[in-house]
């Protein structure tokens, strides 16, 4: 199959925003609302009051950083601060400013050539979702009874039941019971608040496809799909792809898949996935024996986390690049962390060198890099809810050196097309040092990362790069080197440092 992916994503720099925690605008009325203090520690259920107009009012900040695309965590009406419990798929949460605030955000972002991708939660809804609530009220008589997986015997007997478990029922679920047996319906991960949608039902399929198409026509630039593997039906996602691309052929479809994803990346379902496998490899290489796998209890992600030396990391990178078509690799959603993981700096035990090296790799590797809000100023946090802190807008609290490093890397990527669309060449992997080249036409760059705690003096084979003899230009980092007989000679790297060289 001929795989076609969105052109703009190949050049994109993403920034992930958790709307309740990024910024709040005085234009959103909050009189009488009970909100947690903005600078207080995050809690699982508390609201801080961030909104979409807050994002609008800080668009200058994003543009100054170099961001060209925003990925927003869910924004639809919901009773949770993360909004993965969808009440209404056609209404932006009033706490975020409603549909008009989102319309303004799209207008302002697009005027600045910044794309906007929404988080789509299509596997499950919520207890407050109208169709689910209708069944709770009417039982087997509800027209929506086929929208979910209900215990029909329980419905037909009209036994009184509800979606809010008693202490005894919750204890039964916590001890390994499932919501279908205990409460009478199936829920994602047996979380009572998340009734699973029955996507075998024609009406449900049409509803979700219409939602996807509606917001594309509204003006969004793509969908990030929450737990799409839970809808174990290729035909559902193939039609989703057809509807979305029919509304906008350049729309981006990226799935939250934590494992190998060839099934979905054949050109007829998703354009890309969140590249957690590369994240895991990078953590293993940069952290080695300091890697704390216990911080990553998310699905089967933990099994991919282990310390890696340079040759093992290089082999892993080669393997992961070989999984997918080059057109897919160019638009993979590459990240160091997200709302579902501890922040990278916390995982790295506050080792800023690890974060800088992680960014260096992220911004020189094939695919679209994404920064999780606040990482650029040194925001830290362990597993949820700690990784969802409010953004501190007092710049006295920022690490400006970190932010400047990121700005330089973003500019490096923007000004060197080979880093965005060039071919990838493994060049060196030994003693904690990994080097690779990116080549596009006459432009060639070499990235060298020293993840070890010792200075390294090395010569790097230049096989396949076709360089003539002479000095190299250092475009990032601090090092001097030259080419002699096709090899990079006399390269000296300080411990835990990296460099980008250009001929």
Task: Label every model-predicted segment.
Residues 1-18, 22-24, 28-68, 103, ...:
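Carbohydrate-interacting/catalytic domains
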Residues 1-118, 123-125, 129-141, 146, ...:
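N-terminal structural segment of carbohydrate-active enzymes
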Residues 13-15, 70-72, 116-118, 223, ...:
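Hydrophobic faces of well-ordered beta-strands that scaffold small-molecule active sites
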Residues 17, 62, 72, 89, ...:
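Conserved, mostly hydrophobic/aromatic
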Residues 39-52, 85-98, 191-205, 221-231, ...:
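The substrate-binding groove and active-site-proximal loops of carbohydrate-active enzymes
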Residues 106-112, 123-124, 130-141, 210, ...:
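Active-site-proximal helices and loops of the catalytic beta/alpha 8
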Residues 133-190, 194, 284-285, 293-317:
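Core domains of carbohydrate- and sulfate-ester-processing enzymes
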Residues 326-348:
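Active-site clefts of carbohydrate-active enzymes
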């Amino acid at each position: 199959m001929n795989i076609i992916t969105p052109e703009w994503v190949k050049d994109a720099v993403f920034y992930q925003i958790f709307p309740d925690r990024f910024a709040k605008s005085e234009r959103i009325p909050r009189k009488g609302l009970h909100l947690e203090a903005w600078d207080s520690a995050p809690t699982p259920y508390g609201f801080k009051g961030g909104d979409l107009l807050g994002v609008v009012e800080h668009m200058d900040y994003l543009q100054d950083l170099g961001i060209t695309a925003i990925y927003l965590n869910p924004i639809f009406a919901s009773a949770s601060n993360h909004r993965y419990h969808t009440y209404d798929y056609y209404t932006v949460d009033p706490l975020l400013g409603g549909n008009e605030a989102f319309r303004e955000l799209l207008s302002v972002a697009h005027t600045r050539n910044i794309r906007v991708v929404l988080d789509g939660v299509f596997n499950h809804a919520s207890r407050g979702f109208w169709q689910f609530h209708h069944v709770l009220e009417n039982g087997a008589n509800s027209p929506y009874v086929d929208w979910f997986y209900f215990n029909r015997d329980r419905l037909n007997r009209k036994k009184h039941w509800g979606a809010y478990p008693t202490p005894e029922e919750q204890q039964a679920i916590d001890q390994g019971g499932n919501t279908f047996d205990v409460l009478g319906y199936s829920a994602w991960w047996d979380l009572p608040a998340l009734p699973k949608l029955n996507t075998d039902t024609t009406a449900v399929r049409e509803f979700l496809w219409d939602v996807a198409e509606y917001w594309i026509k509204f003006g969004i630039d793509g969908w990030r799909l929450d737990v799409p593997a839970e809808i174990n039906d290729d035909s559902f996602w193939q039609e989703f792809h057809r509807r979305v691309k029919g509304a906008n052929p350049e729309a981006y479809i990226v799935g939250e898949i934590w494992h190998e994803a060839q099934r979905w990346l054949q050109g007829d379902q998703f354009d890309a996935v969140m590249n957690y496998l590369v994240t895991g490899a990078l953590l293993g290489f940069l952290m080695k024996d300091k890697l704390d796998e216990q911080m990553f209890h998310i699905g089967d992600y933990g099994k991919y986390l282990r310390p890696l030396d340079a040759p093992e990391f290089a082999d892993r990178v080669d393997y992961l690049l070989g999984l997918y078509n080059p057109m897919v690799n160019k638009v993979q959603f590459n990240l160091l962390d997200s709302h579902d993981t501890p922040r990278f700096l916390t995982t790295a035990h506050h080792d800023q060198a690890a974060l800088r090296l992680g960014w260096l790799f992220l911004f020189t590797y094939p695919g679209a890099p994404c920064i999780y809000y606040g990482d650029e100023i040194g925001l830290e946090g362990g597993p949820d809810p700690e990784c969802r802190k409010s953004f501190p807008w007092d710049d006295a609290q920022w690490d400006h050196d970190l932010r400047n490093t990121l700005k330089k890397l973003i500019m490096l990527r923007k000004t060197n097309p080979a880093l965005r669309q060039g071919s990838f060449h493994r060049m060196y992997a030994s003693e904690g040092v990994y080097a690779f080249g990116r080549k596009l036409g006459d432009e060639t760059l070499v990235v060298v990362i020293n993840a070890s705690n010792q200075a390294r003096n090395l010569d790097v084979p230049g096989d396949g790069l076709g360089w003539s003899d002479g000095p190299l230009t250092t475009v990032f980092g601090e090092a001097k080197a030259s080419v002699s007989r096709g090899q990079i000679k006399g390269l000296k790297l300080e411990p835990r440092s990296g460099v980008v060289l250009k001929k």
